[in-house]
C-alpha cells in the first residue's frame, strides 16, 4: 500500500505543477474555447451536458469512468480543455469544478424525466384505449358465441334424446340399453287413463311371451314356490360394456354386426359375484334387460357360469310405451306383491315405482359397494313375514 500511496502522491504533485505552469486565459482564447465547446456539445447530444458558464465549458464524464474508490471526490473524473496559450492544440486534464457550475443539472434531469413520464403516460393512455377496444370486441364476440351456443343447445334439447348404451351404430336392434327416454321425461310416461292401466297386463303385438302363455315367464317351478321374484337389470347395474378398449376388462365378447365382428369389453361391478350367489338363495332371479339377446345372452353365459340367474328376458319382452322400452312388471306372470326390481333407470320401472330398489349407474368405480350394501334389505324383504313388498318399499325408500 505504501508504494501505491507514493505513486498517487507523485501524481497529485505533478498535476498541481502542471496547473501552475498553465498561462492565464485571454479573452480571445476564451471565445475560441466557448465556440469550440458549443459545437462539440451539439454533436455529442445527451451524453455530454454543457454548462452555460461564460468562463469555462466543462463536460460531464460518464459514470463508468469515475473511480469507485473516491467516495464522492473528483479523483478519477477528467475534463478536457484546449490549451490556447500553447498554440499546439494539446488538451490539458482539468479537475471537475462543481462550485462554478451555475447550471442546475439535477433540475434538468428531473425535467427530462418528467417529459419522459408525460410521453409514457400519453403512450400508455393510447395503449389502454386500444386494449379497451380489443376487450370490447372480444366481449361482443363472446356474447355472440354464447347466444349462438344457447340457440344450438335449445334446438338440441328440443330433439328426442338419443338412446344410451353400447351399440350406438345405427342399427335399430343393436342398442343394448334398456330405455330410450331421458329422466326429464319420466313423468310423461305415467299412464293417465283407466284404459292405459287396464292394458298394462295385455301383451302387445310382436311382444315376446313364454311359449303357450300370455305372460313373459312360465309358471313357477316347485323349487321357487316359497320365494319372491327379484328382477335385475344388466347394463350399468351388474356390468358395464364398451366397444372401446379397456385394459381392466374382465372379459371380451365378439359380437357380429352387419357381417363384421366387433369386440365388446365388459367389466363387472364390484361384488357382483357375491351378490348373485346370495340373492339366488333367497329369490327366483330374473335378468330383464332392454339389450338385444345376441349381445346379452353370451354376456350372461360368461357372467353367470353357475346358473344363479334363473330366467332371462331381453328387449323383445319390453313394453313399448310411446317409443320407450318399459319393464312391465304386470306382465311377468308373478304376483306384484312378491315382485321386486333392481334397476339404475327409473324410467324402466315407471309403471311400478313402489316395487323398485334404486341403484346408481355404474361405469368403472372400483370402490363401489352398492350391490353388497343392498343385500341386507333384500334379505329382509325375502322373509315370509313381508306380505307385500310394494307397501314396504313405498315407505322405506
From Swiss-Prot:
Superkingdom field: Eukaryota
Function in brief: Probable phosphatase. Involved in the response to sodium and lithium ion stress (but not to potassium or sorbitol stress) by inducing transcription of the sodium pump ENA1/PMR2. Acts through a calcineurin-independent pathway and is functionally redundant with PSR1. Also involved in the general stress response; acts together with WHI2 to activate stress response element (STRE)-mediated gene expression, possibly through dephosphorylation of MSN2.
Coiled-coil boundaries: none
Species of the source: Saccharomyces cerevisiae (strain ATCC 204508 / S288c)
Domain FCP1 homology: 223-381
GO MF annotation terms: phosphoprotein phosphatase activity
Compartment(s): Cell membrane
EC identifiers of the protein: 3.1.3.-
Start-end of Low complexity biased regions: 67-77
Disulfide cross-links: none
GO terms of biological process kind: cellular response to amino acid starvation; cellular response to heat; negative regulation of TORC1 signaling; positive regulation of transcription by RNA polymerase II; response to salt stress
Annotated region described as Disordered, given as residue ranges: 13-117
Principal localisation: membrane
Keyword Aminoacyl-tRNA synthetase: no
Record-linked Pfam families: NIF
Composition skew (Basic residues), residue ranges: 29-38
CDD domains from the UniProt entry: HAD_FCP1-like
Any Gene Ontology CC annotation: phosphatase complex
Key words, A-Z: Cell membrane, Hydrolase, Lipoprotein, Membrane, Palmitate, Protein phosphatase
Matching SUPFAM superfamilies: HAD-like (SSF56784)
S-palmitoyl cysteine lipid modification positions: 9-10
Compositional bias segments (type: Acidic residues): 103-117
Protein name in UniProt: Probable phosphatase PSR2
